[in-house]
Amino acid sequence: MMRKALLVFSLLLSVAAASANPAETTEALDIGSRLELFVDDYLIESMNGVQLRLHSPRSAGQVLAFDRPWEGNTSLYSTVFRDGDIYRLYYRGSSHPDYVVRPLMETGEEVVPSHPQVTCYAESRDGLNWTLPDLGLVSFNGSRHNNLCRFSRENAEGVGVVHDPHDPDPKRRYKAFYWEHSVRSPHKIPVAVEINAMSVSFSSDGKNWTNHPGNPVIPQASDTGHQAMWDPFRKVFVAYGRFGAGGRRIARSESRDFIDWSPSQLVFAADATDTRSRGGRPQFYGMGTTIYEGAYIGLPWLFWENSSNRLDVQLASSRDGIHWQRAGNRRTLIPNGKKGTWDGGCIFTASQPLQGLGDRIFIFYSASRHDHNYTKRK
């Protein structure tokens, strides 16, 4: 069985050198008391004899191995965030059809020869040591002793979760955004609703979820991990995915209530510079996104199709979440390991991947030993 795991990197971004080069007398930007990352040129009027240098993050290694039967052979997408004294982690599992029963199947129904999606839940006090609570919510092969949550009528893929403690309705203080799609199989097991679009669910505790009765909320599909967050400056919820992007590119949508979403807007795509760097047909498979101290920090997943067929991670930033600037001269931030090692194939950063812990910033991501073309990634 292939191995897959949740990993952590510790990150430092800095200016490579200092220079006494006073700017001309202009009105300074008021940044208040917030911290600022020198990840773009937004705060820099001019530079002479200095450069911005992207430092390589230091790996903290594997912190959670996905090896339970219900986690299956493809655990790619995740969400992680701090909630009071704990970190919450939601991650995708999908299992090989030879030994997995679809989560919503009734007793006696046939195994579906497809790849049903499940969503798993874990908790941690420090972001490094994780426990998988026995939630008792979803039956898997006749047992509810597992850490599975249920979000949708069918497959919920790439779940992005937001904690919204200020919602006046306590039943909506956790919000989930995901691609909902029906399982198709030669056995033609009937489903209540044939769906292939973006949906949302709500919860009071982050574990027991209720589907929005008006689903879907965006009439487009998105085969990736999804980013959902609250923008405290624009006072809107923001989602990123591939919905309406036209292939492996990144789209954005906004909502004030997490139900009515704006038309999708293309905001991030590969270009000729990416193609020249390694050849093939580079594409953006997804992008882990965090709003950090006044800026959007993006960790785009570069899929090098027809080249290495692997996925690695770069760094980008934006001041409005729409117009993005690539950092570090497009140098790889999180590289693949050697072929055949646990991170030698594909890397997928979490939704809200940057999490502060003391004087460090953690980057959470999952990794696979096999490239994208391998049919049983894990």
Show where each model-derived region lies.
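Bacterial N-terminal signal peptides
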Residues: L6-A16
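Carbohydrate-active catalytic/glycan-binding domains of CAZyme proteins
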Residues: N21-K378
